[in-house]
Design a protein with these regions (language model features):
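Residue-level recognition of beta-strand microenvironments
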Residues: 83, 123-124, 167-170
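Extracytoplasmic
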Residues: 68, 75, 97-101, 115, ...
């Protein structure tokens, strides 16, 4: 009986990893498109191919970068329950998982907020995970997934700490978790190094 439940659990972990890979592919595709758009916009301003950001996007990007370690959390209250990167599973040591961001446990119906000024680039749905919002901060992107409700629209300009939605509670296990990612171009960043006192 124990082996059967262990098998089911491992299958569930594999399914979660598959879903995480699909999310990563989707995010990369969106970021690729955003970078292409930014380059086109920058070329209209200057024919120099070395500039890839508009002046406004460059200012936002530079400010974002200079706030490493002091960005506000995407929730008023929360605890990091899964960190960035490769880690062994808590129960099955032989099972390794990779997290592209961090998972923050919080209270039911908590509001999610932007960690920095930016523009809503995408709002999309992830099967089994709810809605997700991708915000463009110049060269940087933040991803907020696991939302049941979204307050923003595509193209909206948003300020730091402005509410973007409400976190979803998984009715099967009663978990209320936000999955949060930071990307610099195509490179995944460890969000806990960017958020204020995350370590």
């Amino acid at each position: 009986k124990l082996q059967k439940s262990e098998k089911l659990f491992k299958t569930k972990i594999q399914q979660q990893q598959k879903e995480a890979l699909l999310l990563e592919k989707k995010i990369k595709k969106i970021i690729e498109e955003e970078i292409r758009k930014a380059r086109e916009a920058a070329k209209k301003i200057s024919e120099s191919s070395t500039i890839s950001l508009t002046p406004e996007a460059k200012i936002i990007s530079d400010k974002f970068s200079s706030n490493k370690g002091s960005l506000p959390w995407p929730l008023d209250q929360g605890l990091i329950v899964q960190f960035f990167g490769k880690q062994k599973h808590r129960v099955f040591n032989e099972v390794e998982t990779f997290n592209n961001g961090i998972n923050i446990a919080t209270n039911k119906n908590s509001n999610i907020r932007s960690v920095f000024d930016g523009k809503i680039s995408r709002i999309f749905f992830i099967k089994g995970e709810g809605k997700a919002v991708l915000i463009n901060h110049g060269e940087f992107f933040t991803v907020y997934s696991g939302l049941k409700e979204v307050f923003v629209k595509l193209g909206d300009k948003i300020l730091a700490k402005e509410k973007i939605g409400v976190v979803l509670t998984d009715e099967n296990n009663n978990k209320t978790e936000l999955h949060f990612e930071i990307w610099k171009g195509y490179d995944k960043q460890d969000p806990s190094l960017w958020l204020f006192e995350a370590y």
